Amino acid sequence: MKNLHYIPHTHWDREWHKTFEAFRVRLCYSMEMMLDTLENDENFSYFMYDAQTSILEDYLTIYPENKDRLKKLVGEKRLFVGPWYTQPDFYLISGESLARNLLIGSNIADDMGHSMEVGYIPDSFGQAAQIPQIMKGFDLKSVYVWRGI
């Protein structure tokens, strides 16, 4: 018998075809729906918020009163955040910036209660040869990649 794992998640572009502020309005709306669902629907056990912590800062700038709600869900491992600060595009940056991105993101996630232990890279248009070395340095035992392989 094979196991099928369904992982509810979102990929979040901080800016893309709209402004940062336009996307932040959507972020706040989706974050509110996600929080309400995790807190009130016993059949919805966890959610992965794109492995980046900058979205927590963006949301908490508008709704700082919800920090404890987020911390509770992250600490219970029902809301997975980090280890990145922002999703990197490996074609545009150096190994040093990748390491610092992970350092900042994992520290923020740890402060919230838990940093996801997967090097989640769903939207990079290329990959760096140093990914295994960098992931090992942050004790990330697995990596999820999508395009650019």
Model-derived features with residue positions:
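Carbohydrate-active enzymes and regulators
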Residues: M1-I149
